[in-house]
């Protein structure tokens, strides 16, 4: 990374699959990095990917998975896992399971039955091979797989008396500092500003991310475009409105071409934004690198990335300074931690993308709590949830821009048995 980009990152942010997956090193790029898989940077990342994530030393005897269930009540999904010796874990599924639950029941569920939960790292590798599951990729397999992993981690945490974070790392952030993520791309600048001010005020946010560009994902109108000139107007207006003390970030969701991304990136630099998320489409890795090379502004990426190999490339080739694996979309905390470790090896930061709904904010908090290379602020979309639960170790309120991470075993909360009881088992 250029030294000036490193200084930009520090000044603006602080101030304001390879060895683990047999297919992941095939086709490694040999142009940008020079020597493909033999490049020293790739070799370093491959060594990191060999390192276990789950702290198996907490468990002296096998923990055999006896049952794994997906439960549904209307649009709510829970995963419940039980071991042969009676231990139980539960997770809250992503709303995307409305469309994806058949992959849970048909492609993943049976694979885990009878396995030792202590082998979680290996299970998360081999499940992609089972039934050629790697053909599905992306959120289609990542979301149901994460739902399973979260439940297994909850079970293991309860057995060991450890939080989810403690199972995959050492707690370094007992509180997570958040940024308010906002939407409103399709609305006028004036209406967007009022809604953003409302969101910031609700949680007294000290950091904020806005949407830019014109990706009209919310409509079936193939001719839809965003309000003319919205991006060019809102970037300086947000800085003027919230002042120099507010940390600002921007997300294009892959809308721009390389040239347009560079143009908009320079405007973001002028108004001291902290990072530019997905300036071009997520799988345009070489184009992302071109944008990064032209800007001092750090580039962030990872919400849509579905492979360890993809993250390996963008890290090794300095296409990004910030990685953003989504714990749900990417298949869980173990895989996301592998990404964070790769990033740390080359001085890059990690801040997970956070899916809204359910208890996504809790999984995000546990993950961030053990990062060695966290960003100063992490994505937050509010505390609203349909899940009925109790947390005895944290008020789960935003205070001075921070939320205290639960310290109880597993997820650190107790989901209301009555709420669980409303859910019915989905059979294959």
Predicted feature descriptions by range:
Residues 1-2, 7-34:
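N-terminal export signals
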Residues 23-71, 88:
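C-terminal segment of N-terminal export signals and the immediately downstream linker at the start
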Residues 41-43, 48-49, 88-160:
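Metal- or metallocofactor-binding catalytic centers and their adjacent structured scaffolds
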Residues 77-85, 395:
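Short beta-strand elements
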Residues 86, 148, 161, 251, ...:
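Conserved, mostly hydrophobic/aromatic
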Residues 110, 115, 122, 126, ...:
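Shared catalytic-loop signature of beta/alpha-barrel
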Residues 149-187:
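Glycine-rich, aromatic-flanked loop segments that form ligand/cofactor-binding clefts
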Residues 175-290, 294:
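Metal-dependent enolase-superfamily TIM-barrel catalytic cores that perform enediolate-based chemistry
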């Amino acid at each position: 990374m250029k030294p000036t980009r490193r200084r930009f990152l520090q000044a603006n942010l602080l101030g304001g699959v390879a060895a683990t997956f047999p297919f992941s090193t095939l086709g490694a790029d040999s142009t940008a990095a020079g020597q493909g898989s033999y490049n020293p940077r790739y070799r370093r990342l491959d060594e990191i990917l060999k390192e276990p994530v789950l702290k198996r030393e907490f468990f002296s005897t096998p923990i055999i998975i006896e049952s794994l269930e997906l439960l549904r009540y209307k649009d709510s999904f829970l995963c419940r896992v039980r071991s042969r010796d009676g231990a139980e874990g539960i997770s809250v599924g992503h709303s995307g399971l409305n469309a994806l639950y058949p992959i849970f029941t048909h492609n993943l569920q049976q694979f885990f039955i009878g396995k030792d939960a202590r082998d979680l790292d290996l299970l998360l590798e081999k499940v992609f091979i089972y039934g050629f599951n790697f053909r599905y990729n992306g959120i289609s397999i990542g979301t149901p797989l994460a739902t399973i992993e979260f439940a297994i981690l909850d079970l293991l945490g309860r057995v060991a008396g450890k939080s989810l974070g403690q199972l995959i790392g050492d707690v370094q952030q007992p509180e997570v500092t958040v940024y308010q993520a906002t939407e409103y791309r399709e609305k006028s600048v004036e209406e967007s500003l009022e809604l953003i001010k409302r969101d910031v005020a609700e949680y007294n946010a000290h950091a904020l991310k806005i949407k830019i560009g014109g990706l009209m994902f919310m409509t079936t109108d193939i001719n839809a475009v965003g309000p003319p000139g919205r991006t060019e107007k809102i970037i300086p207006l947000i800085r003027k409105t919230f002042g120099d003390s507010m940390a600002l970030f921007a997300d294009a969701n892959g809308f721009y071409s390389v040239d347009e991304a560079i143009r908009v990136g320079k405007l973001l630099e002028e108004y001291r934004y902290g990072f530019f998320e997905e300036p071009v489409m997520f799988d345009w890795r070489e184009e992302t690198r071109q944008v990064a090379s032209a800007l001092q502004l750090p580039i962030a990426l990872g919400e849509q990335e579905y492979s360890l190999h993809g993250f390996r490339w963008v890290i090794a080739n300095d296409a990004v300074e910030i990685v953003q694996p989504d714990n749900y979309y990417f298949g869980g905390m173990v895989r996301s931690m592998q990404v964070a470790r790769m990033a740390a090896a080359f001085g890059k930061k990690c801040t997970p993308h956070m899916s809204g709904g359910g208890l996504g904010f809790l999984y995000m908090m546990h993950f961030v709590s053990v990062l060695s290379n966290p960003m100063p602020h992490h994505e937050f979309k509010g505390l609203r949830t349909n899940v009925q639960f109790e947390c005895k170790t944290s008020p789960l309120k935003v205070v001075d821009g921070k939320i205290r991470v639960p310290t109880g075993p597993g997820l650190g909360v107790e989901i209301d048995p009555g709420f669980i009881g409303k859910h019915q088992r989905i059979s294959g």
